[in-house]
Amino acid sequence: MNRKRKSRRAGSILCQRLGRAAVVLLALLLAQAGYAHASVALLMEEPYGDFGAMNPTGHSAIYLNHICAASPTELRPCQPGESGVVISRYHKVGGLDWVAIPLIPYLYAVEDVTQVPQSVDKAQVAALSDAYRRKHLLELAPNGSDGRTPKGEWTELVGESYLRTIHGFEVVSTAEQDERFIALFNDRKNTGHFNILVHNCADFSRVVMDIYLPNAIHRSVVADLGITTPKQVARSLVQYGRKHPEVEMSAFVIPQVPGTIKRSKPVDGVAQSLVKSKKYLIPMTILTPELTGGLVVAYMAEGRMKLPKNAMVFNVNDNEMEPGAPWPVQAANTDPNRSLLPAPAAATATAPTASPVVTTVNTPAALATSAPEPPSTLP
């Protein structure tokens, strides 16, 4: 019994130290955001909750590190020291097609990384999200009767890392591309017409990435029955990165914050979700065996993509990065302002206590550290 207690205590201390080191790395990254290279990143977010169990395709968003939000519906260039914005399409949020939220609030529903709790429960997440809403999002989600917190899907705008693990795929961008993106989105009509089949969050990510990398993202008629999914957008981007090393693709993972909230699940495509689920597969096999066989072939042919359950940093070849292993060779870093992050082992445990925040790799010189392993959405 004493051995078990000591083991648990040691594990808890290790998680705390890893969390502090991660905060140091994130602080270094954000401090240099105004000087480092511009980039655009696809965020492929794991499914969670009841809807995620029914539809395990997850959610997708776009992170732009040199573009910031003048408001949730207006974009501007970032000032030195600002960390960029996450933009995505939502269903029934203020009647809008897209909403832009600063990175740290999007992930943690706070305005500074030092405020991120080390672990959370549902009540804490609700309190943090509502506090941010009352300060910044009343126009999109006004108070209910008697000043109460309103129901609705506004909760998807902040605190995402409390609910799920997020996988990121980053490519470099230029100031001219960012300026064009800002002009296009500030001028276009921002009216929601969400449709899960033809106009969903992954379709939005595809449109955004097409501005930066024309024709890089495409639907998969075979693996996803023509529906754009977060996993297909990621797969297309990875394939593009293989063929075009000049985009300097890198990958990162933002782990789900520890706590009592149920862990998110791996992202699936359409065919994959049907093939893997017994509640769909067995009835389909009985009723339409030919169709079921076709789905299995589709999944095996185009639906697979290596995303290890213990969520390491992985590269453009979908290879899992083991802790301490050298980063596989890819294009050399040609940007003298592109700062290298130190290896996590070199970080000092002096940052404020917080949860594991982000593990990121930008170049072959940096090493990856593993994220906490989850026990085994498009919300």
Language model segments and positions:
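Extracellular/periplasmic catalytic domains that process cell-envelope and extracellular macromolecules
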Residues: A36, M54-P56
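N-terminal post-signal-peptidase region of extra-cytosolic proteins
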Residues: L42-G49
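Activation targets extended, charge/polar-rich intrinsically disordered C-terminal tails
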Residues: S129-P379
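Residue-level detector of short, conserved catalytic/binding motifs and their immediate flanks
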Residues: V40, G58-I62
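Soluble extramembrane regions of membrane proteins in the secretory/endomembrane system
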Residues: D50, S60, I67-S71, R76-L140, ...
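Bacterial N-terminal signal peptides
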Residues: G19-Q32
